[in-house]
A protein has these predicted regions:
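Short, acidic Ser/Thr/Gly-rich low-complexity loop/linker segments typical of extracellular
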Residues: 73-85
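Short proline/glycine-enriched turn/loop motifs at strand-loop junctions of beta-rich domains
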Residues: 55-62, 71
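The feature marks proteins involved in alpha-glucan
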Residues: 1-49, 82-164, 169-180, 185
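Conserved alpha/beta catalytic core and glycan-binding cleft of carbohydrate-active enzymes
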Residues: 128, 316-318, 338-372
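Short beta-strand elements bearing conserved aromatic residues within extracellular beta-rich modules
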Residues: 62-64, 101
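Substrate-binding/active-site clefts of carbohydrate-active enzymes
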Residues: 146-157, 166-349
């Protein structure tokens, strides 16, 4: 089989992932994969650029395409790790912060060629564009007082009044009803409103990147990036920081229950059902027309668990609300008789999902006992 890809000319190295990282990745217990996979600015032998790492075990070839190479797959082919983990890696000299990119994956399955966004991208283009962006997260946090005292604020016996909202439709720019406020503008206006009305916390409908605005964020493609509709990652960091300085906690809706089938997203990522179940009775939601995560696959558990911790680690959030839990817990959710597969005991409980939710809950409270 030939693809037209030339021998890799990108500077490559055996990756930042250690043998221990790979062990945890395979075990499903690596809860900070975002530090290892994805795009990270770096330097090799004194040459500045970006290292890339993507999980695509059923790829015959993989490369990174983007602004730095004219979207040509030839210059920057990735190399598969020799440990059989299915991770492909490479270093692109000269790649810079803010540049757009995708992974070009040639699948072993029927030779399909796919152009995919980065599952671990910290930033994306503003929809309807679909490329990931190289991004180095940086913010000078000013919420030390809140962080030091939030165990008291978030205690179960403390006053708790939550304002649930969708950022895009809460308030529009003056004179532009079809536009959006920036995260920074919303932070100031929202904090004033919440303080005046006596709320202790705000719960945001999903801010994770999503292609379809009409989904209100519940069809996520970017599990490690705030949507670019309202600004940059640093703008959203400012949003959280400002609310904390005004005494308001921030809770995020988080959607590990399903994901859309958009061509640039997680569905059929390497030409196979990688993040989802292959059997539609397990891997496709008939009501929502979306894909269901394979919670029994260790690498998928690590991906989702890393997403959950990421928002606490890098964005100082005070809690996550897991969306559509019932659809995760029950194999027959939204299905008629004969449209679902029982578990190993003949029941309708999704045992892998139950285990996954317990693991994520334990991981979050182990690392952050002071959150909701």
């Amino acid at each position: 089989m030939t693809s037209g890809l030339k021998a890799p000319s990108a500077r490559t190295r055996s990756a930042p992932m250690t043998d221990h990282d790979i062990y945890l990745f395979r075990e499903g217990s690596h809860m900070r994969l975002y530090e290892r996979l994805g795009a990270h600015l770096d330097a090799v032998e004194g040459v500045a650029g970006c290292r890339f790492a993507v999980w695509a075990p059923n790829a015959a070839r993989a490369s990174v395409i983007g602004d730095f190479n004219g979207w040509d797959p030839a210059p920057h082919a990735l190399q598969a790790r020799p440990d059989g983990s299915g991770i492909w890696e490479g270093f692109v000299p000269g790649a810079k912060h803010g540049q757009c990119y995708k992974y070009r994956i040639e699948s072993r399955r029927h030779g399909a060629v796919l152009e995919k966004g980065d599952p671990f991208a910290f930033a994306w283009e503003e929809p309807p564009r679909t490329a990931s962006r190289i991004w180095s997260l940086d913010h000078d946090w000013q919420d030390a007082e809140w962080m030091a005292n939030r165990a008291k604020v978030n205690a179960l016996d403390a006053p708790f009044s939550v304002y649930e909202m969708h950022l895009g439709s809460w308030m529009r720019p003056d004179g532009n009803p079809g536009g959006f406020l920036n995260y920074r503008e919303m932070a100031v206006r929202l904090a004033d409103y919440l303080v005046q009305t006596g709320f202790t916390h705000v719960e945001l409908m999903p801010v994770t990147e999503h292609p379809f605005y009409g989904s209100w964020g519940y069809q996520t493609t970017g599990y490690f990036a705030p949507t670019a509709r309202y600004g940059t990652p640093e703008d959203f960091m400012f949003f959280v920081d400002h609310l904390h300085q005004r005494g308001i906690g921030v809770i995020l809706d988080w959607v590990p229950s399903h994901f859309p089938s958009d061509a640039h997203g997680l569905a059929q990522f390497d030409g196979t059902a990688l993040y989802e179940h292959a059997d539609p009775r397990q891997g496709f939601h008939p009501e929502w027309q979306s894909c269901i995560f394979n919670y029994g696959r260790n690498e998928v558990r690590g991906f989702l668990g890393s997403s959950a911790l990421f928002w606490f680690d890098r964005y100082h959030v005070d809690g996550i609300r897991v969306d559509a839990v019932a659809s995760m817990l029950y194999l027959d959710y939204g299905r008629k008789a004969g449209e679902w597969i029982p578990n190993e005991h003949g029941g309708h409980e999704n045992l892998a999902a139950v285990s996954f939710l317990r693991e994520v809950n334990s991981a979050v409270y182990r690392e952050y006992p002071d959150v909701q």
